[in-house]
Swiss-Prot record:
The gene is Trip12. Gene3D superfamilies: 3.30.720.50, Hect, E3 ligase catalytic domain, Hect, E3 ligase catalytic domains, Leucine-rich Repeat Variant. Disruption phenotype: Embryonic lethality in the middle stage of development. Embryos exhibit growth arrest, while ES cells are viable. ES cells show decreased proliferation, but maintain both the undifferentiated state and the ability to differentiate. This is E3 ubiquitin-protein ligase TRIP12. Residues 755-869 form the WWE domain. Residues 1918-2025 form the HECT domain. The keyword Glycoprotein does not apply. Residues 1034-1047 have a biased composition (Basic residues).
Length: 2025
């Protein structure tokens, strides 16, 4: 990260690069995104082996123990079958992907155990001095750091969930010290460099912990994580130290092997599945293990011995080593099956006995599990998803952990130590490493404990201070065996010493640090709650009170119930205003946590605090406000069924304050919090109509209008422009509008809605399941888990496996217990009937008699009228512009309510500006049942209320036509069509909209992705089942109790029904599973459930994934009933309203249609109808309101398309004449043959514009492009972190599941090894090339000679070190193997999932019952079957093509170069005869009546698309039809944009799942390239990034443009983008030379390039952006001879190259031409520079960087291969002076031609006339021109050109040659080199999404424009001491808005590193520009200091200057002087 500091008053200014958190302002809001991911000591996270390694065997304990396990999930289950394996060193990411599963397990021999135990004791006894010395050193080191820790602890420096790169910056703070330490102290330093990002990602103590870890380097507590070792250590102080003994065993195995490193890197351990014969219920496996009694004996003796020698480090009892269960984070990971082990309950029983044998251990286990309520399923009171929403996470168990060895290795490798040295060194280093760190901690703690219990207060104070130091420097690793249960009571005693504030403060602090360092200790610290609260009730010392708040805040994350029931909520808020801001935040966070699972019985605890919390909403502090909002949202969520409580919570002040909060500009609330607050309002309105009435009276309509459309400018009815909002925000806002209106009735036309809800045979919401924690409290499971358990219970399962939050539990129905499969912890469960399950609490289908909203409509019609007028248009616009099905359905319901309750006059008023009829027509043609039903209902209401108007419109717009079609259709909606219409989209008709809630008190779920308490609404399409696919699928494991059931374990009924629903002939088979049942298409696209308009908030039990066990009959009955209803309703509709229609066609509504048909018939190609028919069409289009339906049904589109494009000999009139006629009629250009003498200029384009708009309307109505989105609301009520959409839940699914593949040698080849490793499990999102790497480094890529041995050469585990190194170090390895599924060759860059999905046999089988749109995760078969992938070597002759098929780059074929043989002839003609090729007319390409080759999709709107394509081409290139026309497009391209297609494209491109699987619909990419004009630039730019590069870049781009996705849980998973970064250091003095070298090395690498400058500490985004800007400047140097233009000397603010000349061309740079006689050496040099430029530009685009090159338009035309159509018009863009001369000379040529064509001229008069043709009074001969290029006398236009004068007779040839040489021939060699360089990075064909004039935006960012204060206020973020109201911020905005172009560039380069902003300006700057206050000592004057910056995060540290003039001066000085240096501030 790069700081540009300028805090020295006058002199040398430096820009700073501070990577410590301390450099950042002391708050946690910076934590979002930061730039630098490294300093010298950082090894990128993805290279961690164990992240990629989740496996079935790990889940059961058959995993070899890995030392450097990161992200390890600790599991306490003993595994007696395990072999030790060598400690894995780090594997590169390429090999994390795949592991085979096969490893035999051997029991340990007892003698070996004893021997190792003795050896361990002996060794540990030998190093006492080392460990003591180290302990002293670390404590001493800690004390000074501790002071810093104390200062910053309450203002969390970093949010715990900061990005990885942020953590890296912090870590890189002190690299130099580390290098100089001894091995021992390197350990301490090394732990500083642990991966704080992974720890923080799920750290239970996020903000505060991160604060400590970032400010306290050595021995940092960055890992509170856990692995298998820590589980034991913190459970029992006397338990052995596993790491040491395991390392010694590893050492004995790997001691001297130099292969250690590679073997560990590239050979993940493999375990073969053992056959097992365990009977059901058996609790023993075949291998002998110590029984429970043996365990007890061992434990007892061990405990005695450790008590005797508590000073010496204990050894480990190998048989008690725990298995690990790791989070998979690579791209492919292997898994093996569960081993037999003990039966689930048997193992648990053994563990329980083992624990009972050791009372202390047992007690601690109980306590620790009580502490970790997150270990239980998600319903826990301490659920982490809720905390996630406000940046608090609670899971201690899922924290990542780097082993120290891994960190040391990372450090030393970064310092240049060869990795292979780690082979022999590894075990010894790690052994030394551990001995020094762990030995002293527990003995030290025991000494301090005695001090705490002493009688002397000074001794106690000293002890508690040292205890603080020990804890603040420690973590679970270093504090193994810390006596928590003894220390906590002692500290509580000290906390009660009221007279001694110091002791109290330190005791409180020690308890806080303890919870940070040992998260599970919070279960013991709970006892201190009453004492903490005492400190808040009577404040004696403010420090103690604030420290108590910090401690309580940490406790509240897991033990909020205990705090609430102790009255803690009120106590925390008692003296709120007296506390510092951080303490206030803590108090409000405690309040929010206490409300998390509050029940109605506990309301009295919070009631008195509500006024204070309500008032707090008006506060300015963002975090305080968000906590308060969270508090109310949780209350409303938990009390949603208690109307009286809701009214007490929602006082008038609350509604007013929240309303104001929503409209504050700039917004205080983040997107997630905004969604939560709006959802809270919806819940209130739907459950308590009186609150809805109150909101309407408070003018909520204006608020909503503002939120959707921005500030109103008075003409809201005329033009509605929606502000950009995420789909989730739109969904919530439309839900709220819907709930503000009364509910629809239940009878009449709406009766069908109730029918849609049926089909739920099994009521899985009928009961609530709860589990009991160790304190005896019952917690409900979240709703979806409760449903899963209930469904299994109902079908009589004995047990099910429930996977939640990354842990697996067995729910045993016989013993009513939940058993954690990893730890064996058993908890009681119970089933309670759900009182809400059968009552209709939603108020949906019955219009409650006392619905206050309906009363209001009657009593206050004016209010109702204004509400409807304000919002109807907005709703309509939301419907039209949204592609996501959920939003559209919700809008439809809201519109229906409005239309139903509005009276006729009002309706007439609000509908007059909207094309309602055409929308209804397109809705009726939809394939989505819900939409069709809604459209019929709407049509019926409108005809009842406004029959006169709509009887005409319904005829004209095609509604009648569609309704008749529905009424007559025999096969109504029977087969699901391929495409989904109108964006109701694939999932539009998905799972039914149940919004049931398990219980009012249900916890906001702890699973980030699963909806817990989704609030009621019409169609809150509850995707919880799909969202929890991971849980459901994990049940398909082989049960441990033997073959009781088949391999899959979903309840049998589900399977049965599933199959019946899919196809009646299918019998029950393992193929079916929940996943299948979750696919709506499997039970009929238009089934009853799929359209369950659970129209009002259906809080009743809905249809869940399990409830689809409804019988086939019910489902098909309902489907048939609804089809019947539609048909019957359509029939009635026609009878009622259109039966009396005159059949003679004389209806006045048909007049326009008849006129249009007549005119269309005259557009006949066989007969010349002149221009009259076009004139008639023009008048119809321009003057009448012809409808899309009429245009469609008149045949006009097809006929006009043929008229404009046909080039048939039989045509009566040629195409060019027809085109000119068309232009004449629609554009007023001259008629054919009547061209004027002067220039043809555009006159009026209104008729053409009207035609384009009509065509676009037609397209919107007809198109049926499917959108694969997953945008169902996934919010957990008000409780949690809101995933943006279901896509992130699906990502989570991919994160937890793998595809099983069998690798097989292809039958065609026998010259490579056969794979014998059995099936492998592969990450679905791994690329095919990952499998290649996996095989190649194991020798499978080596082609054998015939005489070599066959298959038995070497084991699968042998790694070819050279190949592995090659794969590691090079991004561009030659492919050795190719892969097939069946006959299909797989591209290397395709995901394995996509390959299997597209090509596997199973996929073929399943295609008839499922498709991509409806089920993104594929049928269950994909996940349960084994897919065969064949491999064979790449043949030599195929290698070149292989790159194209699937290499990373797939280079496009470049155009033939000018020197190729086929060009030789043309060259000669040009040189000898002066013949140059004619200019290509770009119109020709578009004038075709059929789709071009690259359009493969089918759609009803295809003809309209082709016509629009032709119209756009004519508008853009019309001047090619005329000799002398003005080069300007008729209609701006922006007028062709289709808003509906744009909405679909944007929605599609916001979906993370689609991007990760590369599953972009073909229509989108094809339209993007063939018809880019349909989409705005931003959309195409996103489409480009998604399709042109790897998916990591696409995901990164998505996260950059949609920050709210970052709030979802996808960030910490392995699907988060993992972009490799390569850092290079360059010297500023030789920048260009070194840049060329860097591009040569890394240009084509996939890694992101990061630049650092020599002797500067800055690294990351800022220096890298500056690198591109500076290299761009260097390339413009005049001495390089690259560009044409004038030489200027630029003032260089800094640097040594003063006086350097640069080329400047105001029109834009273009290549300097070469003649035929140019020196080859010079040409080669220039070509090399252009090749480098190509690489630089491509790399900049690829890495999202900007270059600062002002290139001309012709340059970009060359890039897009449009050079053949360059004309004299393009000369104006490179040399206007020459261009003007050429234009005048061309005028002479045109006059000459006219004279020659004049038949009346005689030879003499012609000769005379020609001689009088002059330019500025001079004849052509007098101009003295010769055949050389103007401005370049050395470049001859043809051979001997210097000696050929230009005359009137050869003038035309001369002009053609000048244009051709200047734009083509003279520059072709440079551009060929440029293209070669560019295409070495990625193919140029991907740029087809853009027009030439747009490439400047893509490459260089936004154009310079003035900055206005309003935009700056919206886009910039004041923080850390400043708000938008601060004087300094207002000064700054005023100054920036007055900057000129040069000052803007200076400022931007100073703050961001680049002189230009990205497209979109400040809005697109990522991270946003943040202005923070620069602080000084009280004696210092801010006016004496300069501002400084951190370029990586776009931070401007601005002193609070006394006046605006001083600020302006200081800013400009800093910006000028602070260039080109990155130093520490």
């Amino acid at each position: 990260m790069s700081n540009r500091p300028n805090n020295n008053p006058g002199g040398s200014l430096r820009r700073s690069q501070r990577n410590t958190a301390g450099a950042q302002p002391q708050d946690d809001s910076i934590g979002g995104r930061s730039c630098s991911s490294s300093s010298a000591v950082i090894v990128p996270q993805p290279e961690d082996p164990d992240r990629a390694n989740t496996s079935e065997r790990q889940k059961t304990g058959q995993v070899p123990k890995k030392d450097n396990s990161r992200g390890v999930k600790r599991s306490a289950s003993p595994d007696y079958n395990r072999t030790n394996s060598p400690s894995s060193a780090k594997k590169p990411r390429a090999f994390q992907h795949i592991e085979s599963f096969s490893e035999t397990n051997k029991p340990h021999s007892k003698s070996k155990k004893r021997h190792l135990d003795q050896e361990q004791q002996l060794k540990s006894a030998q190093l006492p001095s080392t460990s003591k010395a180290h302990t002293r050193k670390s404590v001493a080191a800690g004390s000074s750091r501790n002071q810093k820790r104390k200062r910053t602890e309450s203002s969390c420096v970093k949010s715990g969930s900061g990005s990885e790169s942020t953590g890296a910056e912090e870590r890189s703070a002190k690299p130099i010290k580390l290098a100089s330490k001894s091995a021992t102290s390197a350990k301490a330093g090394c732990s500083t460099i642990t991966d704080s990002s992974s720890a923080a990602s799920t750290s239970s103590s996020s903000s505060a912990i991160a604060s400590a870890s970032s400010t306290v380097p050595a021995g940092a507590r960055v890992k509170q994580g856990k692995d298998q070792n820590k589980a034991r250590r913190s459970r029992s102080a006397s338990s052995p130290s596993p790491r040491r003994s395991s390392r010694e065993k590893e050492q004995s195995k790997t001691g001297g092997s130099s292969k250690f490193d590679w073997a560990a890197r590239f050979s993940p351990k493999v375990s073969l599945p053992k056959t097992k014969l365990s009977l059901p219920g058996s609790s023993k496996s075949e291998t002998s293990k110590p029984g429970p009694s043996g365990l007890q004996a061992k434990l007892a003796s061990l405990r005695k011995s450790t008590k005797k020698r508590s000073e010496s480090p204990p050894a480990e009892l190998p048989s008690l080593r725990r298995s690990t269960r790791q989070k998979t984070t690579g791209s492919c990971a292997s898994t093996s099956r569960r081993g037999s082990g003990l039966g689930k309950r048997g193992a648990a029983e053994a563990r329980r006995q083992e624990k009972m044998a050791d009372p202390e251990s047992n007690q601690e286990t109980v306590n620790s599990s009580a502490a970790r309520t997150d270990e239980a399923p998600q319903g826990a009171a301490a659920s982490s998803s809720v905390a996630g929403a406000v940046g608090m996470t609670t899971s201690g168990e899922s924290e990542s952990d780097d082993s120290e060895m891994g960190r040391l290795q990372a450090l030393l490798e970064a310092r240049g130590l060869p990795p292979h040295l780690f082979g022999p060194l590894g075990p010894r280093m790690s052994q030394l490493f551990h001995r020094t760190i762990g030995s002293g901690a527990s003995s030290k703690a025991q000494q301090l404990l005695q001090g705490l219990q002493a009688s002397d207060e000074s001794q106690q104070l000293q002890a508690v201070i040292e205890m603080c130091q020990l804890l603040v420097m420690g973590n679970e690793e270093t504090l193994g065996g810390f006596p928590v249960k003894s220390v906590v009571p002692a500290l509580i005693t000290l906390l009660q010493m009221e007279h001694n504030f110091d002791i109290m403060n330190h005791a409180c602090r020690a308890l806080t640090y303890m919870m940070e360092a040992l998260p599970r200790s919070s279960a013991v610290v709970v006892d201190a709650i009453p004492v903490f609260l005492e400190k808040l009730q009577v404040i004696q010392c403010i420090d103690v009170a604030e420290q108590a708040l910090t401690a309580l805040e940490m406790l509240s994350r897991r033990h909020s119930k205990a705090i609430l029931q102790a009255g803690g909520l009120a106590d925390c808020l008692l003296y709120l205003e007296f506390f510092s801001i951080n303490a206030q935040r803590n108090a409000l966070a405690i309040a929010a946590n206490c409300c998390q699972s509050i029940t109605p019985d506990e309301f009295h605890f919070v009631a008195d605090s509500l006024p204070l919390l309500t008032q707090r909403l008006t506060h300015q502090d963002k975090k305080s406000v968000e906590s308060t909002c969270l508090c109310f949202a949780r209350l409303v969520d938990n009390f949603q069924h208690e109307e009286n409580l809701l009214q007490q919570v929602a006082s008038k002040d609350l509604l007013t304050n929240v309303q104001q909060l929503l409209v504050v500009t700039p917004p205080i609330l983040s997107s997630g919090m905004f969604i939560m607050v709006v959802r809270m309002f919806s819940l209130m309105c739907s459950n308590c109509p009186t609150l809805a009435v109150q909101l309407m009276k408070q003018n909520i309509a204006e608020t909503l209008h503002f939120l959707l459309c921005g500030a109103s400018n008075g003409s809201c009815q005329e033009q509605i422009d929606l502000v950009p909002r995420s789909p989730q925000e739109l969904y919530e806002l439309t839900s709220l509008i819907c709930e503000l209106m009364p509910c629809l009735p239940k009878e009449g036309i709406f009766a069908v809605d109730t029918m849609l809800k049926k089909g739920n045979a099994q009521n899985t919401d009928g009961a609530i399941w709860q589990w009991r924690d160790d304190r005896g409290l019952w917690h409900p499971y979240n709703r979806i888990d409760s449903r899963i358990i209930e469904a299994a219970h109902q079908v009589g399962e004995d047990e099910i496996s429930l996977s939640t939050l990354g842990r697996v539990y067995t729910i045993d129905f016989n013993s009513m217990q939940q058993i954690n499969e990893d730890t064996g912890t058993a908890r009681a469960i119970q089933r309670k009937p759900n009182p809400l399950a059968n009552s209709n609490t939603s108020g949906y289908s019955e219009l409650k008699k006392d619905d206050a909203r309906a009363q209001l409509m009657k009593e206050d019609p004016e209010l109702a009228k204004s509400f409807i007028k304000t919002l109807f248009g907005v709703l309509y616009e939301v419907y039209s512009s949204s592609a996501g099905p959920a939003v559209r359905h919700k809008c439809l319901r809201a519109i229906l309510r409005i239309i139903y309750f509005a009276d006729a006059e009002l309706l007439k008023d609000v509908l007059k500006n909207h094309a309602v009829s055409s929308h209804i027509a397109s809705m009726l043609s939809s394939q989505d049942l819900k939409i069709v039903v809604g459209a019929l209902q709407m049509a019926e209401i409108l005809m009842q209320k406004l029959p006169d108007i709509f009887s005409v419109y319904f005829r004209r717009e095609g509604v009648m036509h569609q309704v008749k079609h529905l009424a007559e259709s025999e096969s109504l909606l029977t087969s699901p069509p391929k495409a989904c219409t109108n964006g109701s989209g694939s999932l539009g008709s998905t799972t039914p909209a149940s919004s049931g809630t398990a219980t009012a008190a249900t916890n906001a779920s702890a699973d980030l992705g699963s909806p817990s308490l989704q609030h009621s609404r019409d169609d809150s399409l509850d995707l919880s089942p799909q969202g929890r696919l991971s849980d459901v699928l994990k049940r398909k494991r082989l049960p441990k109790r033997g073959p009781r059931r088949p391999k899959y374990s979903p309840p049998r009924d589900d399977d049965k029904v599933d199959n019946q629903a899919k196809s009646p002939t299918t019998t029950q088979s393992p193929k079916s599973s929940f996943l299948a049942s979750l696919n709506p298409k499997t039970w009929g696209r238009l089934s009853a459930q799929s359209n369950s308009n659970n129209i009002e908030p259906a809080r009743t039990a809905g249809v869940s994934g399990l409830a689809r066990a409804a019988s086939k009959d019910t489902i098909s009955n309902n489907r048939e009933k609804i089809k019947g209803w539609i048909k019957e309703q359509a029939h009635k509709f026609v009878e009622r309203y259109f039966s009396s229609e005159n059949m003679d066609g004389s209806n006045p509504a048909l007049n326009v249609l008849q006129r249009l048909c007549a005119a269309t018939e005259q557009l006949n190609l066989q007969v010349d109808g002149g221009a009259e028919c076009l004139v008639e069409i023009r008048s119809i289009v321009s003057e009448s309101d012809v409808s899309s339906f009429e245009i469609q049904h008149s045949g006009f589109v097809k006929q006009l398309l043929l008229y404009l494009t046909s080039k048939n000999e039989k045509d009566a009139v040629g195409r060019e004449i027809r085109l000119k006629r068309f232009l004449h009629v629609f554009f007023s250009s001259p008629l054919p043959g009547e061209e004027p003498v002067g220039r043809v200029e555009p006159v009026g384009h209104a008729p053409l514009l009207a035609l384009v708009h009509k065509m676009n309307n037609c397209l919107s109505q007809m198109e049926q492009f499917p959108v694969k989105v997953h945008d169902f609301p996934s919010g957990n009520g008000a409780g949690g972190s809101f995933s943006l959409n279901r896509g992130s839940q699906a990502l989570k699914f991919f994160n937890t599941h793998q595809l099983k593949c069998q690798l097989q040698r292809h039958p065609d080849c026998a010259n490579v090894k056969q794979w014998k490793g059995g099936p492998v499990k592969i990450d679905p999102l791994a690329l095919v090339q990952a499998i290649e790497r996996y095989l190649v480094v194991r020798g499978y890529g080596r082609v054998r000679e015939d005489d070599e041995d066959s298959d038995d050469d070497g084991s699968d585990e042998e790694i070819d070190e050279s190949l592995a190194a090659q794969f590691l170090n090079s991004g561009n390895v030659r492919h050795r193997l190719q892969f097939y599924i069946g006959e299909h060759l797989l591209p290397y860059n395709m995901t394995v999932y996509q390959a299997v999905r597209q090509f596997s046999v199973q996929a073929e089988d399943e295609r008839e019952s499922t498709d991509d749109e409806s089920n993104p995760l594929g049928r269950a078969g994909i996940w349960t079957k084994t897919h065969t992938i064949w491999y064979k070597p790449v043949r030599e002759d195929e290698e070149s093509t292989k790159d194209c098929v699937g290499g990373k780059r797939g280079r496009a074929q470049t155009a033939p170069t000018k020197t190729s043989p086929r060009n030789a002839k043309k060259h000669d003609e040009l040189w000898h005869d002066g013949v140059c090729p004619s200019v290509a007319n770009p119109l020709e390409v578009y004038l075709i009546p059929t789709p071009p080759e690259n359009i493969t999709f089918e759609d009803p709107s295809l003809d309209v698309i082709l016509l629009l394509r032709v119209l756009h081409a004519i508008s853009r290139y019309w001047y090619y039809l005329y000799d002398n026309a003005m080069c300007k497009e008729i209609i701006p391209t922006s007028e062709f944009i289709n808003s509906k297609l744009t909405a679909k494209a944007n929605r599609q491109l916001q979906d993370p799942l689609v991007i990760m699987t590369g599953n972009i619909p073909t229509w989108l990419t094809e339209l993007g390239k063939t018809c880019p004009f349909f989409f705005p630039f931003d959309t195409r730019q996103m489409l480009f990034y998604v399709t042109a590069f790897d998916r990591d870049r696409a995901m990164q781009r998505l996260l950059d443009t949609n920050p709210e996705i970052n709030q979802s849980d996808s960030q910490d998973s392995r699907v988060a983008p993992r972009l490799d970064r390569k850092k290079r250091t360059v010297n500023r003095e030789e920048l260009l030379k070194q840049a060329e070298s860097v591009m040569q090395d890394l240009g084509s690498s996939r890694a992101m390039l990061e630049i650092q400058y020599e002797n500067e500490v800055g690294t990351g985004l800022g220096p890298t952006l500056e690198f591109y800007a500076l290299v761009s400047q260097e390339l413009q140097r005049a001495d390089l001879c690259l560009w044409r233009g004038e030489e200027v000397t630029l003032s260089n603010p800094k640097g040594s190259q003063e006086g350097t000349k640069y080329i400047q061309n105001l029109q834009g740079l273009f290549a300097l031409p070469f003649g035929r006689t140019a020196k080859p050496a010079h040409i080669a040099k220039v070509k090399m520079k252009f090749r480098f430029l190509g690489k630089l530009m491509a790399k900049a685009i690829m890495d999202f960087r900007l270059v600062d090159l002002p290139l001309g338009l012709p340059f970009y035309k060359w890039m897009l291969r449009q050079e053949t159509s360059l004309t004299s018009h393009d000369l104006f863009d490179i040399d206007p002076v020459v261009a003007r001369s050429v234009y005048h000379l061309e005028d002479i040529v045109r006059q000459k031609k006219r004279l020659e064509q004049d038949k009346s001229q005689t030879k003499e008069s012609l000769q005379y006339a020609l001689e009088t043709l002059t330019m500025n009074g001079c004849s052509v001969e007098d101009l003295g021109l010769d055949f050389t290029l103007p401005g370049f006398p050395n470049i001859e236009l043809k051979k001997g050109g210097k000696d050929i004068p230009v005359t009137i007779h050869n003038l035309e040839e001369y002009l053609r040659l000048v244009i051709f040489w200047a734009l083509n021939e003279g520059v072709c060699r440079q551009f060929d080199s440029f293209r070669d360089g560019f295409e070495s990075v990625f193919p140029l064909c991907h740029l087809q999404y853009f027009y030439p004039e747009e490439l400047d935006q893509l490459l260089c960012g936004s154009k310079a424009d003035t900055w206005d204060a309003k935009t700056l206020m919206e886009c910039c973020r004041p923080d850390h001491g400043y708000t938008h109201d601060s004087r300094a911020v207002k000064f700054l905005f005023e100054i920036l808005s007055s900057f000129d172009n040069e000052q803007q560039r200076l400022f931007l380069q100073f703050v961001t590193g680049s002189p230009r902003l990205p497209v979109g300006g400040f809005r697109s700057l990522n991270p946003p520009l943040t202005i923070v206050r620069k602080t000084f000592e009280s004696t210092e004057n801010p006016d004496d200091f300069l501002p400084s910056v951190m370029t990586c995060v776009n931070y401007l540290k601005l002193p609070d200057y006394s006046s605006i003039d001083i600020m302006r001066d200081k800013l400009l000085i800093a910006a000028r002087e602070g260039q080109q240096s990155f130093h520490l501030s």
